[in-house]
Amino acid sequence: MSMIDEPLYPIAVLIDELKNDDIQLRLNSIRRLSTIARALGEERTRKELIPFLSENNDDDDEVLLAMAEELGVFIPYVGGVEYAHVLLPPLETLSTVEETCVREKAVESLCRVGSQMRESDLVDHFISLVKRLAAGEWFTARVSACGVFHIAYPSAPDMLKTELRSLYTQLCQDDMPMVRRAAATNLGKFAATVESAHLKTDVMSMFEDLTQDDQDSVRLLAVEGCAALGKLLEPQDCVQHILPVIVNFSQDKSWRVRYMVANQLYELCEAVGPEPTRTELVPAYVRLLRDNEAEVRIAAAGKVTKFCRILNPEIAIQHILPCVKELSSDSSQHVRSALASVIMGMAPVLGKDATIEHLLPIFLSLLKDEFPDVRLNIISKLDQVNQVIGIDLLSQSLLPAIVELAEDRHWRVRLAIIEYIPLLASQLGVGFFDDKLGALCMQWLQDKVHSIRDAAANNLKRLAEEFGPEWAMQHIVPQVLEMVNNPHYLYRMTILRAVSLLAPVMGSEITCSKLLPVVMTASKDRVPNIKFNVAKVLQSLIPIVDQSVVEKTIRPGLVELSEDPDVDVRFFANQALQSIDNVMMSS
């Protein structure tokens, strides 16, 4: 092929591949657009490639999605920002297709391209695109239009700004609910670009239209707009325009709208300020906490700590706590679970006395809840309460419940308790721990569930680190070594695991005198799984013990295992022997 023809080659391949029946080839060629554009050069990309893409009416959504994505980053390949406008026609076409994800990606790319365009080009090219989309015959075009107003508006001259505001008003009143939903979703972004004088008039009237929409799917999106608009308005305007809407929404006939209010209420409080929150929004929140729809109560319960943080403790105790008490015995387990996941955070907000008087009884009732997730959510946050009421009170009031949960029938609850033990141990101190929790830690090593046994072995290591090797030598090692003769091989394996974890904490001397002999005895076990685990443990002990011990005790044991009839035992024994040789060579 001659040099002259070479630049033609990629575009020819591309056009062939773009028309190919095989979707994978079409996709690959779209994803290589930037490479092809570089080969063509900026001018030919503008004059040949982009028009070709504009006319390309591929019917496969995956190909169109890839094209919408590529065009968003295409400015460098068409000659920079001064030519960015040539990318608008193909993106405009893509923003009117039927498939939602393609339209959304095209709108995202339009915004990306538009935000880099020069002001004069925005006025000449981008604003006319917005107007065409907003007046589109198909609802898909009008839906996409809503997402690009905030890019077009700031650089528009005053006359055009007025026109754009009136177009957006029309979209808020469109016949199709899909368009009104898009208008509600994007109102906050558009409002952020509108001058404050028009914000109070035009934008607020659009907002009011949306809040009174007969479709709940539109109203619930308007709820999100409340928080966004609230942040743009002065506090007094916010109280005048936004607050009544929120209060109405909190009593909306559709539970989905009330659910959105419950989810957004914290942000709305920030917008209106502390005083209106106390007088208007606390009653609204209380209504949501007592809503007859469980989904709404779940959303409201999950925000209870956040909401209390912006109130003073007296108001929280007076108005919110009675609802929290009711929710702790709610008929829906999911409501109780949502409450349990955040209620511990209320302790620092309410302070020590109120926590002891009001919250502790609620914690206790949730710790005894029949639904395991509720119990789990309380256990995992106990440290937040400990910081407020102190360990003495925590141990008197909650510890009996914790001990009970250590034998819970749901293994995940037992697991959460085990993971909490080292923290509890460090706070309770060694004396208290030995009295109340020591026996439990041993009991878990013989649990029916493997994850519990594994966590129990890890727990012993963390306790040995917390209280030191001497304490471990007295309270952990003898009990662990006693269990090594358990008739069930799975429990014997747990003990080997515990030994391998304890050895680095206990140090060389105790490992050689107490732990290693037990491992060597286990190497004579009749169960192959035990023997290959012995090989793994011996490998982990090599760096801990002296070289002489490795040669005198560990190597002979491994050599014996390497001649075992079982293939896995031989494999792990040889791996450990290899490890010894490597250590020898490096030293």
Swiss-Prot record:
Tagged with keyword tRNA processing? no
Q: Record's Gene3D superfamilies?
A: Leucine-rich Repeat Variant
Key words, A-Z: Acetylation, Cytoplasm, Nucleus, Peroxisome, Repeat
Q: Which GO terms describe its cellular component?
A: cytosol; nucleus; peroxisome
N-acetylserine found at: 2
Q: Which Pfam families match?
A: HEAT, PPP2R1A-like_HEAT
Which tissues does it occur in? Ubiquitous, with higher levels in roots and flowers (at protein level).
Domain of life (superkingdom) = Eukaryota
Tell me where in or outside the cell this protein is found.
Cytoplasm, Cytosol; Nucleus; Peroxisome
- Can you say where the HEAT repeats lie in this chain? 2-42, 44-80, 81-119, 158-196, 197-235, 236-274, 275-313, 315-352, 353-391, 393-430, 432-469, 470-508, 509-547, 549-586
Chain coiled-coil ranges: none
The entry's free-text remark on domains says:
Each HEAT repeat appears to consist of two alpha helices joined by a hydrophilic region, the intrarepeat loop. The repeat units may be arranged laterally to form a rod-like structure.
Protein family (similarity comment): Belongs to the phosphatase 2A regulatory subunit A family.
Q: What does this protein do, in the record's words?
A: The A subunit of protein phosphatase 2A serves as a scaffolding molecule to coordinate the assembly of the catalytic subunit and a variable regulatory B subunit. Involved during developmental process such as seedling and floral developments. Seems to act as a negative regulator of PP2A catalytic activity. Associates with the serine/threonine-protein phosphatase PP2A catalytic subunit C and regulatory subunit B' to positively regulates beta-oxidation of fatty acids and protoauxins in peroxisomes by dephosphorylating peroxisomal beta-oxidation-related proteins.
What is annotated about its quaternary structure and interactions? PP2A consists of a common heterodimeric core enzyme, composed of a 36 kDa catalytic subunit (subunit C) and a 65 kDa constant regulatory subunit (subunit A), that associates with a variety of regulatory subunits such as subunits B (the R2/B/PR55/B55, R3/B''/PR72/PR130/PR59 and R5/B'/B56 families). Interacts with B'THETA. Interacts with SRK2E/OST1. Interacts with SIC/RON3.
State what protein this is by name: Serine/threonine-protein phosphatase 2A 65 kDa regulatory subunit A beta isoform
Gene that encodes the chain = PP2AA2
